[in-house]
């Protein structure tokens, strides 16, 4: 059963931008995030987080913390009747300090590796899918595999909107709930 997905950037899109999120106390949901994810769940979309986590390569935090943060997100969404179908993260950065994660890779956005991995794992139809993010490189990852992108003005979005476009978005909206409303109208 191939189904469409909505790929979500994590920081600045689903949750507030906190720089390198290295403690759960700094993980703050936008007030509308649970409702937005639940609306996507009910509409039949797979909801997949795709997030660059260069803090691992830079030695700021370790991989178990990413799993802990994603567990917290899962529990918080479940309490509101919502869920994420898959979490994908890239631990790499070409200028890292931790040798095992210091490299150029195909998973770090704007490369589409996390999206293609999710599509294979979850049997997703990329041609009917969307990418929501607050940075041009989020949307570029989607565009590389034919996924339409929606830029949100939360996180780095307002700054990105004012900078030269790396990719042409299908829409630019204020926040995640507006992006979900736009997607549900378009599909």
Each language-model region and where it sits:
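Substrate-recognition element of Asp-dependent hydrolases with the DxDx(T/V) motif
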Residues: 33, 37-73, 82-96, 142
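Conserved Lys-Pro-Asp/Glu-containing loop-to-beta segment of HAD-superfamily phosphomonoesterases
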Residues: 106-139
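Metal-dependent phosphoesterase signature
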Residues: 14-30, 56-65, 79-83, 98-107
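Active-site neighborhood of HAD-like aspartate-dependent phosphohydrolases
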Residues: 1-49
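Acidic, Mg2+-coordinating phosphoryl-transfer loop and its flanking beta/alpha structural elements
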Residues: 127-171
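Structural recognition of alpha->loop->beta junctions
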Residues: 70-89, 162-184
